[in-house]
Amino acid sequence: MSRLEQQLAFICELDKLKEIIRQTQILSGSRRENTAEHSWQLGMMAFVLSEHANEPVDAAHVAKLVLAHDIVEIDAGDTFAYDETGYEDKDAREQAAADRIFGLLPADQAAELRSWWDEFEARETAEAKYAHAILSLIHI
């Protein structure tokens, strides 16, 4: 498979994010949001609210982290905050999903996007901490 074919396979896989219905209602209350909408809104929040971060952050990098963080839901599903059973194997499901989905990309891009996901999950950098802060804010 050519580099372009690998990239397009990944892009087509991302379309599945539109089918994952989350527990969170959109503000109007008319329906629940999907994961693609959730990720897009977080990406915008990364830029718009970055001046309020506790420490300086690279907003573009934060956007990468939040855009990558829920890609694993394509395989692992959205584990709801109150789903105790779902949390039992959440890490294993998400690791396997990350391996498969990011693995659709050419090796260099797979490693880069996987590093964004890993950074988000680790919550160690200023950008990852801010990403988690806006993730908490989106549910208010």
Regions of interest found by a model, annotated:
Residues 5-8, 26-36, 121-128:
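Short, solvent-exposed segments of well-ordered alpha helices
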Residues 8, 55-66, 127-130:
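Alpha-helical scaffolds flanking conserved acidic
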Residues 10-16, 41, 64, 70, ...:
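Residue-level recognition of specific faces of alpha-helices
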Residues 13-41, 81:
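Active-site flanking loop/helix segments enriched in acidic
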Residues 31-60:
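Alpha-helical phosphate/pyrophosphate-handling elements in metalloenzyme active cores
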Residues 44-50, 60-79:
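Active-site alpha-helical segments that house and flank conserved acidic catalytic motifs
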Residues 68-120, 127, 133:
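Divalent metal-dependent catalytic cores for phosphoryl transfer on phosphate-bearing substrates
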Residues 139-140:
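Conserved small/polar residues in nucleotide/adenosyl-binding loops
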